[in-house]
């Protein structure tokens, strides 16, 4: 039996996520130096609304979107009922902040973040995560992104990152391409402090195995609130150092073309596999905000193959597959030998 959340749970999570949106937008405007976010507030007929912020054509970001929403309704979509049937028949509430950044320079990765909270009758949970999608990756950048999120998880519980890292690799996977969307990060969902940490569908996967190894969760509502808070605060220190290192790096039309080609994979994942996109469309969300994650430009090329030994080939052979980014000495050696460590 789940413990009831605090009486002010909805207001508390709403304020957390609004503050997260504000802090991220401020940090991104500062590092961009040129672009400014424009804001649109919107209301949903069935209840709730949000504020969508988009920065276009900055010095760093071709497009950056940071959205907040707070919505409620009476009829749950099937995607939720299939996961938590005990929520059926109850009015529901959901709030979240989501972000996708599409930089101009191919040496600066695309990045995504989402933290959310849901209630329906006796059911409540937290979900969220952040993941990085580089086009011309460097191992040091990958490590910094992972390390900041690992530290954030471990402030709450030493075992969480052991599950959230492989869960991210599992979730952001394009089954029809047999490749990861990027180098991962953290991902978690349906966290209510009861049972196993892993709540995904792949019972034989690495995340499920890690969850079984660490045992059952014993976190309460406040712990999980702190998890969302810590992980949200980890984003800027995980990403801004990459911008500072790569923003001045020169690139050619060839590298821009490859960036646009790989952005096509981002589009494919978000429209075919992403649960957040599906939930938003099923619940009559604001379409412009839901599809804010899509890049302003992308391209597809039939039968593309990267040249062996090229930076483009390194991406698809190494950096779109789950890795032990910190402890694999062969990977570290390879990256150093091929000038893709730092």
UniProtKB/Swiss-Prot annotation:
The top EC class, named as a word, is oxidoreductase
Q: What InterPro entries does the annotation carry?
A: Coprogen_oxidase_aer (IPR001260), Coprogen_oxidase_aer_sf (IPR036406), Coprogen_oxidase_CS (IPR018375)
Which processes are annotated in GO (biological process)? chlorophyll biosynthetic process; protoporphyrinogen IX biosynthetic process
State a single Gene Ontology molecular function: metal ion binding
Its Enzyme Commission number(s) read: 1.3.3.3
Specify whether Repressor is a keyword of the entry.
no
Q: In which pathway does it act?
A: Porphyrin-containing compound metabolism; protoporphyrin-IX biosynthesis; protoporphyrinogen-IX from coproporphyrinogen-III (O2 route): step 1/1
Named cofactor requirement(s):
a divalent metal cation
| Highest taxon listed in the record's lineage | Bacteria
In terms of PROSITE patterns, this protein maps to:
COPROGEN_OXIDASE
The family classification in the record reads: Belongs to the aerobic coproporphyrinogen-III oxidase family.
Its assembly, as annotated, is:
Homodimer.
Protein name, per record:
Oxygen-dependent coproporphyrinogen-III oxidase
Which organism does this record belong to? Prochlorococcus marinus (strain AS9601)
Gene that encodes it = hemF
